Amino acid sequence: MLPLTEDEEIIKQLVNTCDGFLFTGGQDVDPKIYNEVRTKQCGESCTQRDNMETELFSLAYEKDKSILGICRGIQFINAVMGGTLYRDLQTEHPTYTVHHQPHPYDKPIHSVKIMKNSPLHKLLNTDALEVTSLHHQAVKDIAPNLECMAVSEDGLIEALFAPCL
């Protein structure tokens, strides 16, 4: 866990101290990061977190640190690398696949297809996984330096990787 700060010197110290970074779930990624406008369907975002994580990601990427994103984290990484997001899945990507599951949250709700020759396929040696899902934003257009490694039944991108790293 890192302190929430926009102090560039503290962020530089964190990058120099840590071997890698996990960008986690949480509030929405602010649409301005991927050149969109906020709509009434957008959820809460945290400008301070977006600013800190943008600087942190930039420095960590520049220094070739290990970076992993989960949920909001993968969406954030895609956005700061030049990709776009669906601001609200219900209105921008209506589908039969449940991406905002009800309780219990630990029970898989849908499956994802793992792309052949992806790091995830090589790691798990499987073509599909059952997953939980609790988000209303998602990757829309993949950033130029990223590739898809898993998609849901409705074609929504569920996992990305950077082949150059």
Language model: regions and residue ranges:
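Catalytic nucleophile loop
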Residues: F21, L59-T84
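Short glycine-rich anion-binding loops that position phosphate/pyrophosphate groups of nucleotides
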Residues: G26-V29
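Amide-donor transfer/coupling interface in amidating biosynthetic enzymes
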Residues: M1-D19, F23, C46-K63, Q90, ...
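Short, glycine/charged-enriched secondary-structure capping and boundary segments
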Residues: N35-R38, M81-T84, L146-E147
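Class I SAM-dependent methyltransferase SAM-binding "motif I" and its flanking Rossmann-like core
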Residues: R87
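A short, gly/pro- and small-residue-rich
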Residues: I33-N51
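Short glycine-/acidic-enriched loop or helix-start segments at secondary-structure transitions
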Residues: I11, P31-Y34, N78-V80, L160
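Ubiquitous "structural anchor" signal
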Residues: I33-Y34, G43, Y61, M81, ...
